[in-house]
């Protein structure tokens, strides 16, 4: 009986922790976009599950940053609060609706790469 209770408690703790990380990652992405969109009028539609990846290297991050610096609806020279490049990144896809300067609505899906501690956005790309 004690083993069953232990396993159930451990499972519940894991579920609550992963939900907390998902929420923290979503909040980080929302804050990043609110700070770096030229026009802050966006509404979020959905987020993917937070997932780890080791497939992105520093050169790919630099390339993504240069590409995203060209987007007309993003501020130029975004500050990514650079620190040590992590071995493993976490990624999250966000779909949101952006209202452009001329009032048109545009739906965008982007992938955001975060550090494992979920304290900063490392890079992002359009899908």
Locate the predicted segments by residue.
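Sec-dependent bacterial lipoprotein signal peptides
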Residues: 1-18
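Cystatin/cathelin-like cysteine-protease inhibitor module
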Residues: 19-127
